[in-house]
From Swiss-Prot:
Xref: HAMAP family: DHO_dh_type1
InterPro entries documented for this protein: Aldolase_TIM (IPR013785), DHOD_1B (IPR033888), Dihydroorotate_DH_1 (IPR024920), Dihydroorotate_DH_1_2 (IPR012135), Dihydroorotate_DH_cat (IPR005720), Dihydroorotate_DH_CS (IPR001295), Dihydroorotate_DH_I (IPR049622)
Catalytic activity: (S)-dihydroorotate + NAD(+) = orotate + NADH + H(+)
Subunit structure, as described in the record: Heterotetramer of 2 PyrK and 2 PyrD type B subunits.
Protein name (record): Dihydroorotate dehydrogenase B (NAD(+)), catalytic subunit
Cofactor binding note from Swiss-Prot or TrEMBL: Binds 1 FMN per subunit.
Single GO molecular function: NADP binding
EC number: 1.3.1.14
Localization (cell): Cytoplasm
Domain of life: Archaea
Pathway: Pyrimidine metabolism; UMP biosynthesis via de novo pathway; orotate from (S)-dihydroorotate (NAD(+) route): step 1/1
Length: 301
């Protein structure tokens, strides 16, 4: 039988399926449940220095099988999040702490605190497309990205993942600026908009949001392929993964693991068990013994 476990920056995962940072992992009990129902690891909601309410409703628009969201980085603040991590850790699987800030100093404070809370790795949200002063505004500046990653790597011992944006002119330049990160997370959501044709106005209270789900999968596949080919660094693929075939595409493009978000919102928390046996069946039929044998095979041809 094929081995569907994988290793990411030295972290052993029982399968390649992780929970993406987003709207379904706000508290410890939800994260624990997702892990107990088959997720190999979970990435927390992005956490900042202080509590943030986010945007007023509406903050989510269904767009076919995809979503446009502008939640606004709502979170309880780092000082109030430790207990949620403690609860999630009861599942005995890796927890990745996602953090956002506007400069290297704050990113570092958050990362150090996450490490103190016992996370297994840190994911730097350098790419949220809809909050002024954070995310994309930080992640589109290669000098700032380099400063942030380098400073954090000098202060923490756990692996650091840099989540990069598709909403930049040269993602390779940004990836190289973050080269000291232990892995890249590709991609964050695509900046998007929806109009209500009857009210003649944007649907989201923030006007713009981030598009996620199947609509962005080809974009994510492209960037994983290009960044893996250019850098050779470990990559976590994210964007539009709804089934095992989507996950395999990302893996063959160069990802060592994948993250799932919108599909959980659409299809429920049971998706992981189904994808596990489907992946194992595919690997048996195609005679792949290990996940690593599939990583980047499309690049090698």
């Amino acid at each position: 039988m094929s081995d569907i476990s994988t290793t990411l920056a030295g972290i052993k995962l029982v399968n390649p399926f992780m929970v993406a940072s987003g709207i379904l992992d706000e508290n410890g009990y939800t994260m624990k449940e997702l892990l107990e129902r088959g997720a190999a690891a979970v990435v927390t909601k992005s956490i900042g220095i202080s509590e943030r309410d986010g945007y007023p409703t509406p903050v989510i628009v269904e767009y076919g099988d995809s979503l446009i969201n502008a939640v606004g980085l709502s979170n309880p603040g780092i000082e109030n999040f430790g207990e949620e991590i403690n609860i999630a850790k009861e599942a005995k699987r890796p927890i990745i702490g996602s953090v956002f800030a506007y400069n290297a100093e704050e990113f570092t404070k958050l990362s150090v605190k996450m490490e103190e809370y016992g996370v297994d790795a840190i994911e730097l949200n350098l790419s949220c497309p809809h909050v002024k002063g954070f995310g994309l505004e930080v992640g589109s500046d290669p000098d700032l990205v380099e400063d942030i990653v380098n400073e954090i790597k000098s202060k923490v011992k756990v692996p650091v993942f840099a989540k990069l944006s598709p909403n930049v002119s040269n993602i390779i330049e940004i990836a190289k600026a973050a080269e000291k990160a232990d892995a890249y997370v590709l991609i964050n959501t695509v900046k998007a908009m929806a109009i209500d044709i009857y009210s003649r106005s944007p649907v989201l209270s923030n006007l713009y949001g981030g598009l996620s789900g199947p609509a962005i999968k080809p974009v994510g596949i492209r960037y994983v392929y290009e960044v893996k080919k250019e850098t050779g660094k470990e990559i976590i693929g994210v964007g539009g993964i709804s089934n095992y075939k989507d996950a395999i595409e990302y893996i063959m493009a160069g990802a060592s693991a994948v993250q799932i978000g919108t599909a959980l919102y659409k299809y429920g928390k049971g998706i992981f068990r189904e994808m596990e046996w489907q992946l194992r069946t595919f690997m048996d039929e195609e005679r792949f013994e290990k996940i690593e044998e599939m990583v980047g095979v499309a690049i090698k041809r």
